[in-house]
């Protein structure tokens, strides 16, 4: 059901600065930057092997802004790739609580759903179904 870790997300106050730090400090370049009006965030995606680091800067009210205000910058969520998100939600929903009642459109054309943090040790957890293995090949959200 879970195929792999898709990405690890971190909330930052200044996305441009964070992208620069990853590039200069670790030699890791962002392959794309995009904005989600639905989630009220700007995001940068940095490939590390077959997993991505997602840097998230809140640009308005929402979960990411709430997290930043409560916890400061840092680890925000982990995302697991699933083959069929509706089946995964049905299977996992019998023991875990979802924040999303149905999948939503996420970055790069993925279908995504978030679990209630209390379900998995206070860690935001996202499930993502992607049609293509390569995140950068997806249609832009």
Report the location of each language-model feature.
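Long, charged/polar, surface-exposed segments that mediate recognition or autoinhibition
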Residues: 71-72, 86-90
């Amino acid at each position: 059901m879970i195929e792999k870790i898709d990405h690890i997300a971190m909330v930052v106050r200044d996305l441009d600065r964070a992208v620069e730090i990853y590039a200069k400090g670790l030699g890791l370049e962002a392959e794309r930057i995009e904005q989600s009006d639905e989630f009220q965030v700007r995001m940068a995606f940095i490939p590390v092997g077959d997993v991505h680091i997602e840097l998230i800067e809140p640009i308005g009210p929402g979960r990411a802004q709430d997290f930043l205000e409560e916890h400061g910058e840092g680890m925000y969520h982990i995302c697991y790739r699933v083959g069929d998100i509706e089946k995964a939600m049905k299977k996992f929903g019998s023991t875990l609580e979802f924040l999303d009642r149905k999948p939503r459109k996420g970055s790069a054309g993925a279908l995504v759903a978030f679990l209630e943090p209390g379900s998995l040790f206070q860690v935001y957890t996202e499930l993502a179904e992607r049609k293509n293995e390569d995140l950068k090949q997806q249609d832009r959200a």
